[in-house]
């Protein structure tokens, strides 16, 4: 840690002072891995809001649109690799300073970097779940199933959007075929928490339990505009433990922070490598 840039000395000191950090990460942690984020530096949406849970479950055309875009977007998302921010946080854990990492991301890049204690708050995009029988299938296998059913779509390309989505604009999705669950015929959905869907209670309870044992909180790459993540910062503030954030631009918790570093995640955390 002694070779860190002078500008990040305050963050180094914060990490050095605490033994049981609870780390909360967001989309900004993965942008350098080629995965776009949702919001700009002011916390506003860069694109239209992501698909809504109720619409996905009730509207066939919404499911067609989602899976058509995902068929294109998964090709690059599934190849994403951890960047220096992920590796730095894994090193923090290896050094015994991180009690738990709670990520709002669904890309599993923390695990790929070797981080062991990780809670996927919003689920994981590498699995597909049947909403009927609960059966789970690897997303890579479902990609093959989608491709076989929609071979004519495989030649399409589009710019990447967050979380394995692709900006397929002005496409006619009416011909896109969405396979049903082979076991029960149920609706297949990525094993992630959509907007309008609740985070499972046991996941929240487990995260809160780990937070109760922490002596400080470190936020990395999140504007905290979504309440599912922000509530943990509120809980930390209520416990009166120090809270530091690394994020470009404003966060919903700016008035609760002990320290804020407005720098790219991988640069701010470089002293951990």
From Swiss-Prot:
Residue numbers binding NAD(+): 26-46, 104-107, 221-223, 247-249, 265
Under PROSITE patterns, the record lists: SIRTUIN (PS50305)
GO CC list? cytoplasm
Tell me which cofactor or cofactors this protein depends on. Answer: Zn(2+)
Q: What class of enzyme is it?
A: transferase
List, alphabetically, the Pfam families matched: SIR2 (PF02146)
Matching SUPFAM superfamilies: DHS-like NAD/FAD-binding domain
Q: Does the keyword Transferase apply?
A: yes
Q: Where does Zn(2+) bind?
A: 130, 133, 181, 184
Task: Give its E.C. classification number.
Answer: 2.3.1.286
State if Acetylation is listed as a keyword. no
- Enumerate the subcellular locations listed in this protein's record, separating them with semicolons: Cytoplasm
What is the name of this protein? NAD-dependent protein deacetylase 2
Which organism is the protein's source? Bradyrhizobium diazoefficiens (strain JCM 10833 / BCRC 13528 / IAM 13628 / NBRC 14792 / USDA 110)
Identify the taxonomic lineage of the organism of origin: Bacteria, Pseudomonadati, Pseudomonadota, Alphaproteobacteria, Hyphomicrobiales
């Amino acid at each position: 840690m002694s070779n860190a840039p002078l500008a990040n000395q305050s963050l180094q000191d914060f990490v050095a002072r605490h033994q049981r950090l609870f780390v909360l990460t967001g989309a900004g942690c993965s942008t350098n891995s080629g995965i776009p984020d949702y919001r700009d530096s002011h916390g506003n949406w860069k694109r239209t809001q992501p698909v809504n849970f109720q619409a996905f479950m009730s509207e066939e055309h919404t499911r067609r649109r989602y899976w058509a875009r995902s068929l294109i977007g998964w090709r690059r998302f599934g190849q994403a690799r951890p960047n220096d921010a992920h590796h730095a946080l894994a090193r923090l854990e290896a050094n015994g300073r991180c009690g738990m990492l709670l990520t709002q991301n669904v890309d599993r890049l923390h695990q790929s970097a070797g981080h062991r204690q990780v809670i996927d708050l919003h689920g994981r995009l590498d699995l597909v779940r049947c909403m009927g029988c609960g059966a789970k299938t690897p997303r890579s296998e479902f990609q093959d199933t989608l491709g076989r059913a929609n071979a004519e779509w495989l030649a399409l390309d589009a710019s990447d959007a967050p979380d394995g989505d692709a900006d397929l604009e002005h496409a006619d999705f009416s011909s896109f075929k969405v396979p049903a669950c082979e076991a029960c015929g149920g609706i297949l959905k990525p094993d992630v928490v959509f907007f309008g869907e609740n985070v499972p209670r046991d996941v929240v309870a487990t995260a809160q339990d780990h937070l109760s044992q922490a002596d400080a909180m470190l936020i990395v790459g999140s504007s905290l505009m979504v309440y599912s993540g922000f509530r943990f910062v509120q809980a930390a503030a209520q416990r009166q433990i120090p809270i530091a954030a690394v994020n470009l631009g404003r966060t919903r918790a700016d008035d609760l922070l002990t320290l804020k570093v407005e720098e790219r995640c991988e640069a701010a955390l470089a002293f951990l490598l």
